[in-house]
Amino acid sequence: MAQDAITAVINSADVQGKYLDTAALEKLKAYFSTGELRVRAATTISANAAAIVKEAVAKSLLYSDITRPGGNMYTTRRYAACIRDLDYYLRYATYAMLAGDPSILDERVLNGLKETYNSLGVPVGATVQAIQAIKEVTASLVGADAGKEMGIYLDYISSGLS
């Protein structure tokens, strides 16, 4: 079950029936110290999500064989489904970044996704390439530190699909 960083630390101590130890408090301190950065990044991502996805597609997919007749993204319907999926990955990576917990991505995005893509003939490699382009575009908008933080969750999705 997905938990935010705070709940995970507290639940771990609670299961053991003890107060938070130094290591647990350090985890919370690290989480809180990056809180403002994560919120600012999420604000920027939310305000620019469509542009992020559009630019990422242009960088990674638009002029490749995948969008030409016979390619897996050919036809408006398939292209629209790809855009929808990339937006979905960006949104859930943003949620996970705010929570400080990638397990949200397992539960809400990755469970069964690779198998579904393979059964539908969706090219996983091209999808991973587009997610990496989202990571680059996002980092250019939110800055290096927030981009690195967000990159953790986009890389997690890429790894889960690979």
Swiss-Prot record:
This is Allophycocyanin subunit beta. Pfam families: Phycobilisome. Heterohexamer of two alpha chains, one alpha-B chain and three beta chains. Contains one covalently linked phycocyanobilin chromophore. The chromophore is added by phycocyanobilin lyase CpcS 1. It is a peripheral membrane protein. Gene3D superfamilies: Phycocyanins (1.10.490.20). It is found in: Cellular thylakoid membrane. Coiled coil: none annotated. Light-harvesting photosynthetic bile pigment-protein from the phycobiliprotein complex. Allophycocyanin has a maximum absorption at approximately 650 to 653 nanometers. Disulfide bonds: none annotated.
